[in-house]
């Protein structure tokens, strides 16, 4: 993999802002779990895009990213439709085969709604196996 993970600079925190829209809510007008996870995935993808290692950057080299695990803690009350949220992602650990991303999703006032960790691994399109 030309974008060898051992030599990629993955420091810093990436922040995104989200406005909860109709497609992001459950029947009670609150942010759905699926949407919270989508914000996590989208923020990690933006983090990788800024560093030129997003899926569309590594696909021509014969690789893609696979999410192998996500764990997330949620506060009791989900944000409501039209609330603004801020996400933060950062790499907490990097190995030759995995990138561990920590995630936070906060309300505008800074109150944390969700936090968690996910594992992303580059996989060879030819073999379907993780890149070593």
Predicted regions located by residue number:
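Hydrophobic beta-strand-centered segment that forms part of the acyl-chain substrate-binding groove
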Residues: 47-95
């Amino acid at each position: 993999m030309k974008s060898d993970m051992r030599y990629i600079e993955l420091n810093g925190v990436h922040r995104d802002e989200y406005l909860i829209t109709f497609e992001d809510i459950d029947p009670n007008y609150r942010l759905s779990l699926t949407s919270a996870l989508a914000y996590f995935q989208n923020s990690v993808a933006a983090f990788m895009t800024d560093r030129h290692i997003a899926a569309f950057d590594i696909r021509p080299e014969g690789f893609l990213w696979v999410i192998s695990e996500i764990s997330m803690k949620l506060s009791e009350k989900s944000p409501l439709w039209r609330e603004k949220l801020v996400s933060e992602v950062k790499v907490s650990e990097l190995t030759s085969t995995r990138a561990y991303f920590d995630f936070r999703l906060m309300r505008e006032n800074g109150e944390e709604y969700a936090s968690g960790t996910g594992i992303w691994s580059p996989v060879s399109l030819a073999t379907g196996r993780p890149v070593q």
